[in-house]
Structures are given as C-alpha cells and as structure tokens.
Amino acid sequence: MEEFGKLEERVVLVGVQTDDHDNVEESLDELKELASTAGAVTVGRIIQNRESVHPGTYIGKGKIEEVRALVYAMDATGIICDDELSPAQLNNLERELDCKVMDRTLLILDIFAARAITSEGKIQVELAQLRYRSARLVGLRESLSRLGGGIGTRGPGEKKLETDRRLIRTRISALKQELSQVEKHRELIRSSRARGNMKTAAIVGYTNAGKSTLLNTLTGSEVLSEDKLFATLDPTTRLLNLKDGQQILLTDTVGFIHKLPHHLVEAFKSTLEEAKYADYIIHVVDSSNPQAEMQMHVVYETLKELGAMGKKIITLFNKQDAPGACVLRDFKSDYTLKVSAKTGEGLADLNDLLEKLLAEEQIYVERLFPYQEAGKIQLIREYGQLISEEYTEEGIAV
C-alpha cells in the first residue's frame, strides 16, 4: 500500500456557508481530518457566507484576494475546497490563485486510492478517478503538475497521469467490463448463500465508527482496524457462530461520509450494495463523536440512495468506553444497543438479539428418515440446523 506523507503539502481550507448548507465549520473540521489522512497539513481556513456558491469561482472576488494573501502568508502549497468544483471553477481558481487547487472529491478519491488493496477495490478507485478527471483535464493537468506528486496523483490509475480524453474513455470502458465480471462473481456468491439459507448482516456506518473493530471482536478475525478515516475500503465477510449454535455472515463495508462523491457511489456500487442484499443492517454509530446525529443522517440517506432501507436495522451506539459517549434517538432503527467493540461491552446483548431474530425466521420440522436415506441428514447439517437426532428401529428421527 502506498504511504501517505512522502510529500508534505501545506493547505488552506476554503468553504462556503449557504442558507441551505450544513454547518460549514463542522464540515471543514472533517475536511481537515481528511487532509491529514492524505498527508497534508492544514495551515488555515477561510469561510464565505453567500446565498449560493459562485458559479465561476466558487467564492467571490474579495474572498479570492483573502485566500491568495493567506496562501502567501502561510507558505501554503495549495487550497482544498469543501465542495466538488465544476471544471470552470477549478480552472478559474487555478488561474486566479496561481497555486494547486483541489476539492473534497479529489481528496477523498486520493485517500481511497491509497487504501485500495484488492483488485476490485483498485478497479473501482481508478474508475472513479477517471470519471472525475475526464471533465477536468486542463485544470487538473496544470494544478497537479505543480508539485509533481501529492494529493490527486496517487492510485492504481496514476502510474501516468492521463491527459488524453480518448484514452480515458477507452480505459473507462475496459474498467467497466472488468467490474462487470466482479459483480457477476458477487452475485454468484450471494446466490450460493441464499441456497444455503445462510443469513447475512451488513455492518454499515460513518467512516471510523468502529465497524472493523466490531467485526474483529465478534468473530476473532484480523480485519485492518485503525483509528483513521477509510481504514477499511474493501468489504470483508466473516462467519459469526452464535452461542446457541446458529450462524450468520457479517460483512464489513466501506464507511460513509458527508458529501460522499457521486463518482465513488457509482464506482463502488457493487461493494456498497452488500447492504442492499443483506438480511439485516447493523448500523454502527460513534457515540462519542459530537457530530453523531449528523453522521447517522448521512448513513441513512446513503442507504436510501442504495435502496437498502426497508429491512430490520440494529443500531449500535459504539465507543461507550470513550469520553462523551451518549445514546441518541434513532427512529429509523428497529433495535438499539449500547456497546463498545473495543471492550466487548454490550456484545452479549447483540448475540442474544441476533439469535432471537434468526430463530424467528426458522421453520421447525420433525421427520423420520429410513436408514437408507441417512445421507439426507448431512444436507440438513449443511443447509439448515440439526437440533437433535435419535436412532430408532424404524430410522433416524430428527
């Protein structure tokens, strides 16, 4: 995996507060954390209050002067805008500021590029990167060449920064075909699980909510779990053996985030749809985060976009061991539990709840198999749950 921080970038964050916009200060706090994840140091921030973003330059002319002065004073190498810039906005800001210009989408794509491990993840990232760049070739070519590296130049598709629109279209077409094969493979796996009557639960949540830690603690696996944004990019599925002998498959998914780029939603559709096809949703919330309520809203909006609502949802208010942990109201959830994936607090209650949910869906059957049909009992073990068996003179009673 490529390491962040080989080339330190000093950046100024720029945001626009509009009437219909969320709190931009909080959004810039998250942007700062994203920038840090990508190896950049935030040296300042500027916010403009406007009815709407400037269609040509994102911010007004007066604010551009302020940004230029701050970039110079702090010896910054570039700026990161809190929203996705249009091609015109990118080109105009690049020309006005004479420094590297990036936006939230480019930043998140860059982090994803360094986090991708599997071939599927790399294909999805490259596809998202190329779709984003195809409309911004001129501005990005100039901006990203300023430092010869850094944010925006990482990833499987960045061995050579493509600046030819025709080549990009050809590459996108090839990636779509590769991704189509991956999606077919995923469908086969899902069909196999369905035939085996194996229930699945998708673990979803805002990035860094503790999803991978939960999966590791429950199943004893060793999925990459770090206290950083997007530590997990590729979905991981593990078998959970419940205390009563029942089993369920748990899938750890990529974390959601505020203003998740449309390019990523499209490219990662096959991965994100693990939530759509799961039998249950386990929604992990970082209960110690002051923005927990906003993060819950983002998760549900993303699930709605994916068509993954309408099934039983278990909300886990995680990190109860952390200072400031709380429990919020979740009207979209069927069940809520207080847990700590780190210490194990509350996980016994989760086990009991999963046992209850699985038991409610089971059909109990009693049958006597003649000894010549004993082989069928093995099929019961494979595709169901054998509660008891008794050998009698007539055959095997199950």
Descriptions of predicted regions:
Residues 1-110:
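N-terminal accessory targeting/assembly segments
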Residues 1-13, 32, 135-209, 215, ...:
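C-terminal-of-GTPase-core extension/linker across diverse P-loop GTPases
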Residues 17-21, 50-52, 84-87, 106-109, ...:
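Conserved nucleotide-binding/hydrolysis micro-motifs of P-loop NTPases
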Residues 18-23, 53-57, 115-119, 159-160, ...:
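Flexible beta-alpha connector loops of hexameric P-loop NTPases
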Residues 20, 26-36, 41, 68-73, ...:
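Conserved C-terminal guanine-recognition region of P-loop GTPase G domains, centered on the G4
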Residues 106-128:
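Short alpha-helix plus adjacent loop in nuclease-associated cores
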Residues 184-186, 191-199, 217-249, 257-267, ...:
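Switch I (effector-binding) loop of TRAFAC-class P-loop GTPase G-domains
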